[in-house]
Amino acid sequence: YYFSMANLLKNKNFPWVLRAAKAKPDAMFAIAGGGSLAEEAGRLGLADLPNVVYLGYVSDGEAKSLMANCRAFLFPTLYEGFGIPPLEAVACGAKQILVSDTPCMREVYGDCAGYIDLDTNPGNVDDTTPPKADPQLLLEKYSWEKSAEKLLDILKKA
């Protein structure tokens, strides 16, 4: 299954996940998140997709399990400051992360993510740029130890 954590904020691009599910009816899509996601799907004319499961709010433990066992974690955000959920998915053992092809996501995830070109891809998980590097490399790049070292360097220079 493909897994996404969604809400109704426009920048999270929840409709892309639904269009992806419609384009790939043989795959399951699990969507966790608060708000009336199913109602929004109805408003978009995508309510009756048999391969979509709306999980509602899930606990941290449930989210970690879903991330660890998914085929890919989907993060088709329109804009984002950093985008922590895909990094969390990698830390939980997600096999692949698919993120929007935006400058921020490229800077954060580099070669470790698959990329969704939102300008040309209306919703197809198979039409993505595959990752060129092991996503586990992200855990080294953004470890607590590295973050602490960077902070210490900044404090020493201040």
Region locations from a protein language model:
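Carbohydrate transferase catalytic cores enriched for Leloir-type hexosyltransferases
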Residues: 1-158
